Regions:
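Amphipathic alpha-helical "coupling" segments that flank catalytic cores
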Residues: 1-240
Length: 240
């Protein structure tokens, strides 16, 4: 890959020029096909993706696309493709997918990133994918997944077999053990943390905090009978 611009003015000029080029070609339906890309639009789009990511800053690409489209029309250059913005959005998403593959991000993480992608959050999405890819096969990743699976399997079974509704209304006043109290406190601490941070900026720390729940989650399930005969206690433990 060639170097991308780093100075603010150069970044702005590079991004707007590339998007303006793509808007013009997509606007007259001159788009790449599976076998042909005569105007190197795939390389142009990848240049936009790389410039955003390597400068470590989200940019409002959707707004730039809309503004560029309006300029063409205002200057009398009628764009005949009514699906221009959607098609260019999907094209850039596809280039982002390609970029993630080049960085050896796992397929399932790539697809999760693409499904929720906003063009205005490309760097944030990349960072999340990179951090998740890094942690998922580590011990911390194993801890996150095992904690989630153990809880979700019990919940799914109870909700399916006993038609119990979960309303997130845990009553700590009827806890019978410290294991319940410890899990309740851990959940409250995590909720408090997530309510006071920017998840996009603290993604790695957020994952590590989730991994840290394994001990208290497993102690709860190893020592507390969730499927209690007393319906009130059973529902409260499921709520927890």
């Amino acid at each position: 890959y060639s170097k991308v611009p780093k100075k603010a003015f150069s970044v702005a000029l590079s991004i707007t020029d590339k998007i303006d080029t793509m808007v013009g070609f997509f606007g007259i339906n001159e788009k790449p096909t599976s076998s042909k890309d005569p105007f190197a639009l795939r390389r142009t789009a990848l240049g936009v993706i790389r410039t955003v990511i390597e400068n470590k800053k989200d940019l409002k690409l959707n707004d730039i696309i809309k503004y560029s489209s309006s300029l063409y029309n205002d200057q009398g250059n009628k764009l005949t493709n009514l699906n221009l913005q959607l098609e260019l959005h999907n094209f850039l998403k596809d280039r982002f997918r390609y970029y993630l593959k080049e960085k050896e991000i796992r397929y399932d993480i790539i697809e999760a990133s693409i499904s929720s992608l906003s063009l205005n959050k490309i760097f944030s999405s990349y960072e999340k994918a990179r951090q998740l890819n890094k942690i998922i096969n580590s011990q911390q990743g194993v801890d996150i997944i095992s904690s989630y699976k153990r809880a979700s399997n019990i919940l799914e079974s109870e909700m399916r077999d006993n038609k119990i509704e979960i309303n997130n209304t845990t009553d700590p006043g009827i806890f019978k053990s410290d294991f319940e109290k410890n899990l309740y406190k851990k959940i409250r601490d995590i909720k408090k943390y997530y309510s006071t941070i920017n998840n996009d900026e603290n993604f790695e720390k957020s994952l590590l905090i989730l991994a840290d729940t394994r001990k208290v989650v497993f102690e709860f399930f190893d020592n507390v009978k969730v499927n209690e005969e007393n319906e009130t206690l059973r529902k409260n433990r499921l709520e927890l």
